Amino acid sequence: IMTTPESLPKVFSAAENLKIDLFNEWFCLMDESHLLVKDVDYREDIVLPMSSFFQFQNKALVSATPIELSDPRFKEQGFELLEVVANYEYRYPITVMHTNNPFIHIREIIKKAERPICFFINLVDYCYSVIKELGIENESSIFCAPKSQMKIKHDMTLGEDNGVNVYDEWREERMNKYNFFSARFFSAFDMDLEYKPDVVMVTDVKKSVYTILDINTDCVQIAGRLRRGFNSLTHILTTDDAIASPKQSELEETIKLQENAYNYIRTLYDNAPSEIAKKILGDTMRSNPFTKLIFPSGAKNYFAIDNYINEYLVKGLYQDYELIREAYMNSDMFIPKFKENIQPYTEEDRLVVKRANYSVKQKRMKIVEILSKFELPYNEYDIAFIDEARHIDPLIVEAFELLGKEA
C-alpha cells in the first residue's frame, strides 16, 4: 500500500477494521526520508506517523540524499546505515556560476537557448519577475504549489493578463520553451521527456533567502528529476557576507540553552501561585523558540531539531563563495566547474535606470554611478548596459562619454 505520511492513519484504520496486524506482518518503508527533516517546518504532520513507524517489526528508510537523523530511537532499535555505491561514473557535471547579478546570466542563457530550459527557483515571485522582465510570457510555464498558482493568477488579473501559463501539476504537454519549477517539484517527481533540456538552478540570497538550495539535497534531487538526462546543468548563485555561518556545535548549544530556559519556565508555570502568574509565564514560555522544536505533548521533535540545524548550516554556506566551492568539491554527486562574474552593477541598479517610478535625476545619477565603474576594454555585459542606458537617456550617456564623471 502506497500512501503519504499524513494519510498513513487511514491505512491503520482500514487495517484495524480488517483485523490485519500491520506491525508484525507488514514491512514499512519510508521513501524520500530526507523530507522528514527538510519539510517538517511547514509540513508538521509529516513526522506524526513516525511513532507508529518505530512499532513495526520490519522497517526501513530510504533516500538518494539522506540527512543524518538524531532521534535516539534509531540507535535504540539498532538501525544500520547502508550505502549503495555505484561501480560506474554517476556524478553530474555542473557549472557553478558565482555572481552579484544573476539576471544577466539568466538573460544570456535564454538569449542563447537552442533547446527548452528548466529553471528551478524556490520563489515563485522571482520566476514571475524574470518572465515579465524578459517579455517571455507566451513562451513560459510555471509549475508551483496551488496557493502560488492562485496568487500569480490573481496578480495577472490586477494588470494585463499576459498569458503566463501557471500549473500546480506537471504534464509533458504543458512544457514550454522556458519552464520554471518551484520547490514543490524539487523531489518525488519525475520528468520523462523525449529530449534533454538545459537545467538552471538559481539561488539569489541578495533577493531572498527562500531561494537557497541545499547542495547535498535540493541540487541532487533537482538533477535527478530528468529521468532521461539533461543537456547541461548550471547553478547560478549569489552570496551575502551578512549571513551568519554558525558551526553545528554552536547550534546544538543554542538549542540546549533554549531547552533549559523552557524547562525552567515550565516548572514555574506548573507551580504558578495565581492565574495572572500562570498567564505571564505561559506567554513567556510560548515565546521561547524551543516551542517550535517540540510536539504539542511536550516531547522533543527531533526532526524539527534536525531541520533547525540543517537549515542554518545550509544557509551559512552562502555567506562566502569559498564555502560553496568547498561544499561542491566535497559532494559525491557533482563534478563542478567553477566560474565567477562580479558586475559593477546589480539588477536592482539596472531597474532604477529602467523603471518609470524613478525621477530623471535619480536615473541619471545611477547611470553615471554605473558607467564610472566600467573599465576599458568594455566586456559584453558593460556594452549591453551602455546600449540600454543610451536608449533610455542618450543625453546623459553622451555627456559622460565626452566629459566624464566629474562633469
Where are these regions (language model features)?
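SF2 helicase catalytic motif II
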Residues: 5-8, 16-60
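Conserved strand-helix element at the start of the C-terminal RecA-like helicase core
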Residues: 2-5, 106-135, 142
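Interdomain hinge/linker at the junction between the two RecA-like core domains of SF2 helicases
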Residues: 64-111
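Conserved helicase motor
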Residues: 4-10, 122-125, 141-165, 182-184
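SF2 helicase motor core recognition
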Residues: 8-20, 63, 127, 167-199, ...
